[in-house]
């Protein structure tokens, strides 16, 4: 199995001071200290650590060759909860995008590095078939502000910045890895890949956690989601959701996946864990109305290869997620995607996994 993983990695605190007034007041304060404020209580708690996650998605489980969306890898760092202060308020300029509530919790998810690779079905042709999707790579970094309200709804705003084209190193990762590590030939048509182009993707998404039933420590819930993404990489609107069965369901909103795909999230609140060993099985899907996909439509500012994309695309997914205390999380999922362009031969399927650990 041909897995290519991109790794990398890195947290803060608050303080307060209260002026003394009169000698008598100071003596009373020593005799009967004032109740601790929420800020004092937070400062006295052990600092929660951030988490590093590695995601790998690959089609090798379902075929003996690469085709279409053949490889995705991403390293991300989820911060501890942001406390009151400039970092907490830095995203308030987004205003109504983030609902206001007294119990909101914010975290920042730094997308350290990500890469996606796309190829036609027949890797031996050079130039490749004009009716098959073009060779392309996407290399990016970015971040997402995640805010939870009421313990059961999550809002995210993500910015991804990078490059599409030879500078994304798709050719080197696919061909050099295959020949040096696995010993099989790579794609012969990379000279025809999309040209270099700055790549931007802005995404706004919502998740809701709807409990259905819980019995004997095992629960069932439904997590619907809606997502709008815009940019020269992707422009689409999506709705979907997953059903989960297991324990500690209120610690997260489902496993994350690389866009475009059923958009889970890195968000987790381990303080809600109900057992040392957490697990759940999940199944669901997502439907997308697609206005732009650079990997099918071709370059925005230059002539390049392209195919006629389909405006509606759907994904079905199923898998399992596991965690041990607050230290390690792992999930594995399988995904099947409907045809993305006219003339495509067969649907695509791939496997994805995530490994997360505290730093």
Q: What positions do the PLM features span?
A:
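Outer membrane beta-barrel transmembrane domains
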Residues: 121-124, 242, 247-359
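Transmembrane beta-barrel strands of outer-membrane/channel proteins
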Residues: 52-58, 109-117, 159-165, 206, ...
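Residues that define the transmembrane beta-barrel architecture of outer-membrane proteins
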Residues: 67-73, 135-139, 155, 196-202, ...
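Extracellular loop and loop/strand-boundary signature of outer-membrane beta-barrel proteins
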Residues: 98, 126-131, 186-192, 227, ...
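Long, hydrophobic/aromatic-enriched structural stretches that serve as scaffold segments
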Residues: 93-171
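Residues on the lipid-exposed face of transmembrane beta-strands in outer-membrane beta-barrel proteins
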Residues: 73-79, 113, 141-147, 161-163, ...
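Short loop/turn motifs that connect adjacent beta-strands in outer-membrane beta-barrel proteins
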Residues: 37-49, 81-107, 148-156, 209-222, ...
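Short glycine/proline- and aromatic-enriched beta-strand/turn motifs that initiate or cap beta-hairpins
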Residues: 24-30, 35-85, 113, 118-122, ...
